[in-house]
Amino acid sequence: MKTYSAKPSEIEKKWWVIDAKNIVLGRLASRVANMLRGKHKPSFTPHLDCGDNIIIINAEHVKLTGKKANPKDGKIYYRHTGFPGGLKDTTAGKILSSKHPERVIKMAVKRMITRNTLGAKQMSNLYVYANGDHPHMAQQPTVYDFASQNPKNKK
């Protein structure tokens, strides 16, 4: 029996909408990363973008477990400006209470996707919105009920 390898013309992409209200961030990011890669499909092919398009709404209401949401000493995100002594840091709590709370979900998913051009293409299929509105109604997305799959998903 030969290993199945999908062709680009055979790939069908679905649109999913996920409500992130009171959902644990790491569990959500892990599932979304697998769906963006297409690993939930039996026709998964590692070298092709066979994942689906994901819309996440209510990103500002995502939950972090433990002390990670603490704005003072919670989960720390580091970045570097490129200049000497340019290491900057911020916490997940500060990002969630700032102007762009959707960045926490995007960073969590991005760090679970492969770091190459295919991963960048797959990340372009992720749409995250801070509130409950999204402009993708024309694509007729299917609601993905993530909270009811496992009681640990919701907090």
Swiss-Prot record:
GO terms for molecular function: mRNA binding; structural constituent of ribosome. GO terms for biological process: negative regulation of translation; translation. GO terms for cellular component: cytosolic large ribosomal subunit. Signal peptide: none annotated. Disulfide bonds: none annotated. InterPro entries: Ribosomal_uL13, Ribosomal_uL13_bac-type, Ribosomal_uL13_CS, Ribosomal_uL13_sf. CDD domains: Ribosomal_L13. Pfam families: Ribosomal_L13. The keyword Mitochondrion does not apply. Keywords: Ribonucleoprotein, Ribosomal protein. PROSITE patterns: RIBOSOMAL_L13. Belongs to the universal ribosomal protein uL13 family. Part of the 50S ribosomal subunit. This protein is one of the early assembly proteins of the 50S ribosomal subunit, although it is not seen to bind rRNA by itself. It is important during the early stages of 50S assembly. HAMAP family: Ribosomal_uL13. This is Large ribosomal subunit protein uL13. It comes from Rickettsia felis (strain ATCC VR-1525 / URRWXCal2).
